[in-house]
Amino acid sequence: MKIFPAIDIEDGHCVRLKQGKIGDLTVYGDDPVKMALKWEALGAKYLHVVDLDGAFKGNGVNTEVIHRICQAVKIPVEVGGGIRTEQAIKQHIENGVWRVIIGSKAVASPYFAIQAAKKYGVDHIAVSVDAHGDTVATNGWVDGSRQKVLPFVKTLLENGVNTIVYTDISRDGMLTGPNFEMMGKLQALPGIHLIASGGVSCADDLRKLSDMGLYGAITGKALYEEKVSMEEIVEIQEK
């Protein structure tokens, strides 16, 4: 299983939110590039970077910082947050981003994500499915939608998008464990490359996700709060 240390960027700082609430924020560093190099040096094989300003404002506020991360590290970097135009995808890919994660725009227009996967390749486009219960949220998790998780994901899978980043918003940043029940339902869908996000509290959570056959898992707060170590991640992640 691929394990992605998370770097969430807000106003140029490395932060973590609780349940996606911008008012409930902990700062873990003021240099995202330095943080990326740290995780790489400790054995990370991938990085998951989020432009939180972009997620809330709808455009790529931290694009330059993300570009510098991609220039600094040698490992693949996936990026999400406020990516809602084809030009934004193109810019990230040209800046060295390995995989672009589309969220709110894909909920509003699944066709947008489907076309992006066709243009840039299925390995380089993912869709972020961020949910309150079984309902998909949008716009920095502030707004609800009429989309239900499983039918929405099935539509994407049937049309050429296979990498899905699933977040249970109620668990994100809470160290309460992932939503294993929903992970099981999603993992059962044919052809899915499922990445678990939100709630990882310890190495055993990662081991369980790996045993379930998931493609990947993202860990943020558990890593920053030393509930899980990079040594454990190196041991669990794909050899």
Q: Could you say what each language-model-derived stretch is?
A:
Residues 53, 58-120:
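Glycine/small-residue-rich loop that forms an oxyanion/phosphate-binding "nest" at active or ligand-binding sites
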Residues 46-64, 104, 165-176:
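Glycine-rich, proline-tolerant flexible connector loops at the mouths of alpha/beta enzymes
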Residues 70-73, 77-99, 181-216:
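Catalytic cores of alpha/beta
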Residues 83, 94-112, 168, 198-202, ...:
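Glycine-rich phosphate-binding active-site loops on the catalytic face of alpha/beta enzymes
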Residues 8, 39, 47, 79, ...:
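Conserved, mostly hydrophobic/aromatic
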Residues 60-67, 142-151, 176-184:
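Charged helix-capping and loop-helix junction motifs
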Residues 2-6, 46, 74-78, 98-101, ...:
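Structural preference for beta-strand elements that scaffold enzyme active sites
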